[in-house]
Amino acid sequence: MTAHRLFHYSFVSENHPAKTPMSLTPRRTPPTVPRRGPRRPVMPAPAALPTRIVPAMIRRTAACLRLIAALALSAGLAACAARAPTPSATARARIVTDGYFRIAASPAPRETIGLPYRDWLPPGRPRAVVLALHGFEDSRNAWSTLGPVLAAHGIAVYAPDQRGFGAAPGRGRWPGTATLVSDARQMAAILHRRDPFIPLTLMGESMGGAIAIIVAAAGDPAISSYVAIAPAVWGAATFPLPLHWVVAAAGTLAPRLRLTGRSLHLRLSDNLAALRALAADPLTLHAAPLGMLAGMVRMMGAAQRDCARLAAPRVLLMYGGHDDVIPPHATAACWRAIPRGARATLAWYPADDHLMLLDHERRTPIGDILSFLRHKRRPLPSAAATDAMIFLAEH
């Protein structure tokens, strides 16, 4: 999620840009002309649907739509979506590339593609390795805050641009959940082969957290533990009924329609300087096509379902009390679905936002991540695990 999500989304097309945000206004019905003759009996309204329920349904649906817009959810009908321009460095923002992951280019496994990455490495042999997956519309630079901290404690961090984002192939086109999951597994295998005796952690934020959950549910012999930071687990099963129709129709009826940020009052982080830097980053993907909505929703639904299948060696699931993107009931549903006996650590941070690694209060979640990576059996140093029980009791 990027900095321009601080503003309101309006719907614009490539050929007909809108100057004002779309708004929902009640339809005015023309006055009826009274008929002559006997009046027909008027059927009473069903008692099971009081009229006050209708405005409540509209408010809930509108709230869901605003959260969807904040995510700028993206998938489906990639062939119909226009390609995003290739990112280029600017005077204020340079593009740092430390290497490339060479992976199979599905569906043509004999061909390979390169996913550029940044790395933050300790001076000597690392005690642990982290493969860090960014969120939607973000890039490898999402980890520029956490990466140096982990490297200073002997942990190597590799942060790639995932396919469809940053400077990776297919920028601006949704590659599909299966492709993103396959890419993550291939990159993990590459890092594991470099040194099989160093524990490898798959870490993801938002969309990247959803991928981490999906991989963890199926298991991967190369990966020792998982960290999901504000994972996108808002599955369609938790949407109100009208939103099902929106999701189903968006990719078919308006695949080229784009979402641009204007005046959406959602706080992604309390660190405005960091949000502005993300918005100015040339690797950030802006105005994703609305046709990509359906696929990302499917990914979130898959991650939500896979919460019930988590059987990984160790998993840390983190969520902020001021997360305006993933609703609390979706996170609570995921946490409650985790099987008993699973080695999952739940952590709730009442003071943090969706992009908690950028927050002014980021020291607490970063300290918990560091402890989780360094100490297998030690509890988190903060009160986040206790606060998680309070969160579940309230939701």
What are the functions of these language-model segments?
Residues L317-Y319, D323:
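Short beta-strand/loop motif that positions the catalytic acidic residue
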Residues A351-H395:
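Catalytic active-site module of serine/aspartate enzymes centered on a nucleophile-bearing elbow/loop
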Residues I58, A72-P109, L115-P122, A393-H395:
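An N-terminal hydrophobic leader/cap segment in hydrolases
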